[in-house]
Amino acid sequence: MFSLLLVAVLAQGPLTPPGPPTSPAPDAGVADAVVPPLPVASLPPATHDLFRRIQGRVSQVRIIERRSGTKSSIGSAFFVSEKGHALTNYHVVSDVVLHPEDYTAELDRGDATVPVRLLAVDVASDLAIIQVEAPVADFFRLEDREPPQGTRLFAMGNPRDLGTTIVEGTYNGLVRDALYERVHFSGAINPGMSGGPTLSGEGNVVGVNVATMGNQVGFLVPVTKARQLLDRTLALPAPPDAAALRKSVGEQLMANQQRITDRLMATELPKQGLGDYRVPGRWSPFLKCWGDTPHDPETPYTVTSYQCSSEEDIFLSSSHRTGVVTYLHQHVTSQKLGAMRFSALYSTLFSQDPDPVPATREDVTNFRCKSEFVDVKGLTVRAAICLRAYRRFPGLYDLVLRAATLNASTHGVDTSLTLGGFSADNARKLARRYLEGLSWTK
């Protein structure tokens, strides 16, 4: 990178040695023009002054693997109380929550490394609060409300273990129709900056760095979520142990799936036309929907797809995501294949596994499935419903529903629904409502 910068600098230099500067001869009787200095009030606030004032409030979080005694991952955190409370992301400290026997956390204060205690998490917002033992004199104030759109902001953190940095960007409001509240920040948030603060020009916290899509598209946890978690933590009668922390994660996941279920069940399921069928459309504004029909003249059949999914999820661990709703419809038709060959094609399509919610065997059990033929308002449908349980969080499941219409010999709709992190009752309830959205228009 440094060589590229050097090349860029050299490319801007002159091609020939510069001669003495020249200037046009002044007109007789005309005084030299004097350019007035720019008023100080019109200059932007100096980023280096802000950085110098507050850099001691931001620290690097190190997750230490106990057996090796070395760091396995890093993030950022910032102090928010004189009692040593600091905010960071849940995903930064998730290993400590899920595997406290294998991992611990510490803060690099620059002149010393100090152990921290994990006090509270908000898994849906991706927040956590840690605490150092000694009190701190210098800490951030959390803003009471979101800033106006277009406000100039400053993100801080420790990108790629390069030391504390400050990055300028712009506040662009809450992400519209998001399942989990996020702020759109136009600025660079790089790996290692997760859990760091994003600040107003006065140095107050307006959000917590959480994710990036690259190309100056970053995301923050709203400051209101951070304040709510801090208030709950300060009200704790005693620090929780590891079992209580994990239990709180399960309770939060259970509350989150209930919120999503209530929201979907309270909404009329819209219908989307797909060939001669009507299928579930965009069930809620937090779902993004897309459609496509590949065109290959050599293929003797046509597949038109329509897919909806929640673009956000909940990070549980590096191997496990949850809090997901996604579904896919495929309308298959052929004028070239006979009934027998189309049936074989259709069966192959039905037997393909949809992409499940990311998880490993340590996270979830194997799927257990039940297959049957059902009548949906006169439309015969072959359906298979599969559930797998969460090992660490009893009562939570992933569901996969597969269904295919069977009313025609050379066309049909194959559909799949995937739900991540729901109770068994709520998952089945949503699957039934989903199946009721299938119909034939002829």
Each predicted region: which residue ranges?
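Flexible, gly/ser-rich surface segments that form the specificity/activation loops bordering the active-site cleft
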Residues: 92-97, 138-183, 190-193, 210-219
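Catalytic-histidine neighborhood of serine endopeptidases
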Residues: 74, 81-124
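C-terminal subregion of chymotrypsin/trypsin-like serine protease catalytic domains
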Residues: 51, 201-267, 428
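N-terminal activation segment of mature serine protease catalytic domains
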Residues: 20-76, 238-239, 243-295
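Surface-exposed amphipathic alpha-helical segments
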Residues: 227, 237, 282, 286-287, ...
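Signature of long, low-cysteine stretches enriched in small and polar/charged residues
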Residues: 344-405
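Non-catalytic interaction/regulatory modules that flank or connect domains
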Residues: 256-368
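Catalytic nucleophile loop of clan PA
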Residues: 78-79, 188-208
